[in-house]
Each structure stands twice: as structure tokens, then as C-alpha cells.
Amino acid sequence: MDAPLTLIGSGMAALGLVRQLRERDARRPITLITADSGDDYSKPLLSTGFAKRLPPERLAARSALEVADQLGVVMRPHTRVTAIDPAARRLSIGAEILPYGELVIATGAAPRVPFAIPEAVATRVFTINDLDDYRGFYAALEALGRPARVTIIGAGLVGCEFANDLSAGGHRVSLVAPETTPLPRLLPEPLGRALGNAFADAGIDVNLGRQLEALAAEGSQVAVHLDDGQALEADLVLVATGLAPRTALAAAAGLAVSDAGIRVDRQLRSSQPGIYALGDVACVAGVNAMYVQPLQASAKALAATLAGTPTEVSYGAWPILVKTPLLPCVALPPHRPLARWRLEGEGADLAALAEDEDGRLIGFALTGACVRRKVELARAAPALLV
């Protein structure tokens, strides 16, 4: 029997690829090896569940067993690949050796935690990047038996979405970040200020321009010490300080990697024959776009390639929809040199148009009522990868 197509990972990228492949070939042997539960869930829902008090089982569309049965694959959950031998086309899982025919690395990205977490508070400090993480944080909230005081460290996409969601769920939220406005990578300052104001108006304690100095245990609470002398009291702390592609396994196997991920071409091929990368771990022709539409486009292109039709992926001008109902936000960050932001609108209903030196639109950011312009502006903006 031929060695199977093997995927490391079972998130949206991996399962999206398998579904695309099964449309082309129902019988090809496929094995999925994943460090987590292997349940099928939509990752974007992780930052919308607490407002509705959704238990983890409500987020999972199918269990790992159901996924394996539906897609006709071998699923190995809670299993870590320890080494890849590209020359022999073999994987190691501890002492176990598994041959593969072709390999797809879809290990995603891991939360970046840029500070030490003292052991005394470790059980009360969380990151949420997958369903297992959600399970842990949900259990901690439920164990309190009352609305929690949650301090979120980080005001990027993940931090802002969870701040909105937890606040909507009745929890007392503090948001801490060194930047002066929320979503600094997506929104220019006037729009970021509008989002910060919307958070503050909703009762979120917004602490921007502040550095975390220390976390310390104070009885059953966590004291979050800031550089202005404040000590915020929290039942739980959620760290949302960015993501880093999980490249260690690939790097150890000799694949070309960078801080942006495993380097692959537009056919998702790595520097080693027979090995591909997909999703948040992949840097495609110099671009790592950790959002759903690029992931889906990559899965579709790679499925065609693996089925015998080499296909290059293209990314359109796909805006990012931020899940902050307190103030809807949409952004298409410019990926070409920016000359200026041109601001339109008033109050919290703002449009910021990114222009190059020749006045051409190269990106945009929208808040409030202006988000309705996203389709019109996306049509006028340049594609991310063509």
C-alpha cells in the first residue's frame, strides 16, 4: 500500500484541504495527526462564544471521530510529531516511525507571550487560540459562579474581539496595551480612538499607553501591575499579545523558514520535495495572511495541486472584518508603501483611505456606518497576491 498523504494539524486549514481533496478523490489514504482534540470547529467563533455563554461542545460541529468517519481519514488526536525526515519521507512520533507519501504542515500559529508568568498565578492566566484553550477559560469562568473581572493584555485583533465579547457576556473587562489606540496594525489613530471610546462607553476599563510590569498573586486574585503605578485586580488574565507561526518542527527538518512562517511558493511547496505548508504557519511568496479567506484559497489551490493539477494560489483584496459589535470595524491594511491616510466621515462613522504617492487606493479602514463601503472599496483596491 502506498504511504498516505499526511497532514500535521486539524484546524480550518487542514480540514478545508481534506474536504477539497475528497471532492476530487474519495479513496486516497489520508492521515491527520494533531496535538489537540481534532474536533471540527470554526476558529473565528472562539471570540464570540462568551457573550452567549456557549459551552465548548456547542462550538464543535463534529468530534474527531465524526470527522474521521465523514472524511474517510485516519485521525490521531492529542499526538505530537517529534521529527520529520524529508529524505526518507518519514515522521517520528516519539519512538514510532510513520512513512508518508506527501506531507502538509498545517500547525498554525502559537500565542506569543512576551513575559514570564509567575507560577503562583499560572492557573489564572490564559491564552485562547484553539478549542481546548476555550474549554479551559470557559471552565475557569464557570467555576467563579459570578461575573468575572478579566484583564486582557493586548489590544490587537484577538484582544479587542475578546474584550467586546466578554463585556457583552456581563464580565468586567480591563484592556491593557502599550499602544495608544486599539488595533494599531489595522486602524489609523482616529479610527482606533473611536473604537477605544466605544469600549470605554460600554464600561470596559481601557488602559492604553501602559506597559505591564508584573503579575502577582493576591489571595484568590491576580494583581496586574502597570508602569503608571496602577494595580488592576483580576480574577483571570487573558494574554493576547500576538501569534507566532509554529515553525520549529519544520526548521529542525531543514525546511526554509522565517519569522513569518514556513517559506513556500504559490503552489504551497516548501524547500523540501513532497512537503507543503498551509494556513497560519505558511508564508506564501513572502506573504502570511492569517485570515480565513487566504486560508480557504490556499486549501483549494493545494488540493488541486495534490490531485495532479499544479495550481498557484492568488489572494484578492479581502478586507478583515473585526468582531467588535460595540463599533463595527473593517480593514484592508496596505501592503504597498503608504504615502498618506485620507480621512472621511465624522464621529465614530469614519473611513480612512490609504493612498500611495500617486493618490491610488492601496487599502482602507472603516468604522461604524462606514463599514457598508467595504465591498465598493475592496473592488478598487489592489489584490494581495496575484
Language-model-detected regions and their locations in the chain:
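A conserved beta-strand/loop element that lines the FAD pocket in flavoprotein oxidoreductases
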Residues: 70-85, 202-212
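FAD-site-proximal beta/loop scaffold in flavoenzymes
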Residues: 121-146, 223-225, 231-297, 301-304
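Short hydrophobic core segments
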Residues: 8, 98-110, 232-242, 299
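Glycine-rich dinucleotide-binding loop and its adjacent helix/turn
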Residues: 107-169
